[in-house]
Amino acid sequence: MTTFLGKHSEADDHIAQLRWLGHDVRVVSGGHDKEGVLDAFATGLELPDWFGRNWDALVDALRDLDARHGVPIELVWDHAATLREQDRRAYDTVVEILEQVADERDDLYVTVITR
């Protein structure tokens, strides 16, 4: 499941509520182009060294993302507005990847915040 929040939503409250519910909240911040967003995911999710910084590698890394403590993972992609405005194709690709992997996994939920 993917939740989309805009710049006028209570994004910080949403993240706090997910933490309160006991979800394993992992925040990825920003990215203004393909390279930047792949770097943001690598850093924000502490992806392994084999992560090749391409779309296929992102899919593989998200599929392999370990759930800590057996609780659901809530992947929050925050500050996604810049990529959406500067490179809509890359933004759409990231959203498609996130939705695809979330559909494949029972323990992964996604929030995209475009602020």
For every predicted segment, state its role.
Residues 1-115:
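Positively charged, polar, low-complexity stretches
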